[in-house]
A protein has these predicted regions:
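Hydrophobic N-terminal alpha-helices or hydrophobic patches in metabolic proteins across all domains
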Residues: 21-308
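N-terminal amphipathic/basic-hydrophobic helices that include classical n-h-c signal peptides
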Residues: 1-19
Length: 308
């Protein structure tokens, strides 16, 4: 904590010196000094927030599902930049960049100072907002297209929220996926049952035609759902003239699309399992996973880029 406060004070001093230099409008010496002060301000912010970046990195490494959504976010950002000829330039401060950096400092250190009073959820929200604002600040300094930077920053903020939801919603998502899958399978098979095996690590099992199937963590659909949400967020935020409510509805609807397609994946796997046998089960398990993931991405792209 003391390190954070020291970095905070040091960065505040740097920013005040920078603003004074700008207002004094002195020759090139002050301009060069201001230039390296900009970099120091960003370095201080990055150093202060490095534990959060490390935690996010560890979460991505530990979770294949979270890794999928992160890859989708990065690839979507690159594709948008390439398709709209958005190119980075040498970093430099602007009023918008400075505002975003100040917001990052205020949110991040506000979370550290008021964490005990706010509670864990508001503290995490403030912390992640601060980290996202820092990324927006760096983006505004490196890109001229503000809409692109804000779209990526907003999608990244949603990704940070998903990073803490990956374990919280594991069991509820498995239950929901199992219920919808059982409902669809019951249309074709009279002997469908869904069971919950309680214990230190609760499990969801499905019995179809006398055969039992485990709805494991990999089947909870978090990977496809989070990827749909992140992809929809960056596309709708960048895409234009829709209202905030419509954009929010599209993002939520994209998550619902991911949930439905994940349930259909489970149905497809169970339907093919008796024919595939034990040796072919894993192949079809993975094949249907990739197929429905690709379908979900295509549907979300179509939905998010559709003209209002």
């Amino acid at each position: 904590m003391r390190i954070f406060f020291c970095l905070h004070r040091f960065a505040a001093l740097i920013l005040s010196i920078y603003i004074m230099d700008e207002n004094e409008n002195k020759p090139d010496t002050n301009a060069r000094r201001a230039a390296w002060l900009e970099y120091v301000a960003w370095i201080c912010a990055a150093a202060a927030m490095s534990p959060v970046f490390y935690w996010l990195g560890a979460a991505v490494v530990d979770s294949q599902q979270l890794r999928d959504s992160f890859i989708i976010l990065v690839v979507a950002g690159i594709v948008i930049a390439m398709s709209h000829e958005i190119r980075p330039h040498r970093p430099h401060f602007s009023a918008d960049s400075l505002t975003a950096l100040c917001a990052a400092y205020a949110a991040f250190f506000g979370a550290q100072i008021l964490g005990d009073r706010l509670g864990i959820i508001p503290t995490l929200l403030l912390t992640f907002f601060g980290v996202s604002a820092f990324i927006v600040s760096a983006g505004l300094a490196c890109f001229d297209r503000k809409r692109y930077v804000y779209a990526f920053g907003g999608a990244f903020f949603i990704f940070t929220l998903l990073s803490i939801a990956v374990r919280i919603f594991d069991l509820p998502l498995r239950m929901l996926a199992g219920k919808l899958s059982a409902l669809v399978l019951s249309l074709f098979n009279d002997t469908v049952g869904l069971y919950m095996m309680k214990g230190s690590d609760p499990q969801i099992a499905m019995n179809v035609g006398g055969a039992s199937y485990l709805v494991a963590t990999e089947c909870n659909g978090f990977g496809i759902i989070s990827s749909c949400i992140v992809l929809s967020a960056i596309l709708t935020f960048f895409g234009g003239s829709r209202s905030i409510l419509k954009k929010g509805a599209i993002v939520i609807g994209s998550g619902l699309i991911g949930y439905i397609l994940n349930s259909l994946r489970i149905v497809s796997i169970i339907a093919v399992a008796p024919l595939a046998g034990e040796k072919g089960y894993f192949y079809w398990h993975e094949a249907f996973g990739y197929f429905y993931f690709a379908v979900a991405m295509l549907v979300v792209i179509r939905l998010s880029r559709r003209n209002p």
